[in-house]
Amino acid sequence: MKTTILILSIIVLFSSNSVLAKTINGKPRIIDGDTIHIKSNKIRLHGIDAPETKQTCKIDNEEWYCGKQSTKELKKLISNQKVKCITNDVDIYNRFVAICYVNEININQWMVENGWAIAYRYYSTDYIVEEKHARDNKLGIWKSDFMKPYAYRQQNKK
């Protein structure tokens, strides 16, 4: 019995690691500022949180669609090129969580560093330095007043 449990534990351990270490390549469809699809794979960009598509930000009391702009900036960065995503988790919506690259550029890092997403501290400590750079230089959404994307989602639950 102990041998069976040990063997099953080893199988589970190795099978879960192989899923988490998956590499996905291809031309993505951009869903929003932190989500892409490659073929049938839904991918959430690790460690970042971008404004939701319908989310607005304010500059001098003027609203602008920062969520749509975040998506546009991601599309511009990828510009119909192939990306490489290295998964490290699967989220509660059954999406792969991954760090993705276009050429040698870390897409996740670029989105935060240029102010089109924030570091998602709830799940990761990655990209905090990049967020500070964007905030200090008033890049992207940091040039405006905005609600953190996770707070926006909470407030606008359907």
Task: Explain the meaning of each model-derived region.
Residues 4-11, 15-158:
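Small beta-barrel nucleic-acid-binding modules, primarily SNase/OB-fold domains
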